[in-house]
């Protein structure tokens, strides 16, 4: 079973499905890292006194959160590198984010474990408190994160379906007919999936 980093979910699965294998989806680990990186960026922006540096820090949010391998535009890559060179904690956090994603690209579970252990060590050495706290969460869920190598499952499709349902709920806001909502749900999924 694939889940996020919620203690309630992992506890419920362990309690009610004791024989089920539990995998923490890599999307959720990456999302947590992106949230911490953005929070750090905002903290650094508030602490920065130089107005020009503040503008640079504020203007690179989407570049920080984007997959580094997907930044092909020279101007964007240059802008990111310039911003990172101005702020060491932000640079460290950014490269830790990129390193974290490599856990799921390893050829074996053992290599992924070694990389994850090294990542946690680097985070602790960085002394960036937001990330140190996250590292303790990663350490607590390490078994479930690495379980991906045994089961290779993700909850991406379910997350996508949930997102489509949320969008549909916003689109038909004000309709009071539950039967109509149910029909729209079936029509929404009829094209791609059979429920």
Give, region by region, the residue ranges found by the protein language model.
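Acidic/histidine-rich catalytic cores and adjacent linkers
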Residues: 2-19, 23, 27-31, 49-195
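Short, surface-exposed amphipathic charged segments that create phosphate/polyanion-binding patches used
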Residues: 34-45
């Amino acid at each position: 079973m694939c889940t996020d980093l919620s203690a309630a979910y992992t506890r419920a699965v362990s309690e009610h499905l004791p024989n089920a294998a539990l995998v923490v989806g890599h999307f959720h680990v990456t999302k947590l890292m992106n949230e911490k990186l953005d929070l750090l960026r905002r903290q650094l922006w508030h602490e920065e006194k130089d107005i020009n540096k503040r503008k640079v820090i504020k203007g690179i949010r989407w570049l920080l959160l984007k997959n580094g391998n997907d930044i092909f535009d020279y101007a964007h890559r240059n802008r990111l590198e310039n911003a990172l060179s101005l702020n060491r904690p932000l640079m460290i956090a950014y490269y830790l984010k990129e390193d974290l994603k490599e856990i799921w690209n390893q050829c074996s579970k053992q290599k992924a474990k070694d990389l994850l252990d090294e990542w946690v060590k680097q985070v602790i050495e960085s002394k960036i408190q937001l990330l140190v706290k996250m590292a303790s969460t990663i350490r607590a869920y390490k078994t479930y994160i690495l379980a991906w190598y045994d089961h290779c499952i993700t909850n991406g499709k379910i997350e996508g379906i949930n997102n489509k349902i949320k969008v549909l709920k916003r689109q038909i806001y004000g309709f009071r007919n539950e039967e109509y909502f149910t029909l729209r749900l079936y029509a929404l999924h009829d094209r791609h999936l059979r429920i």
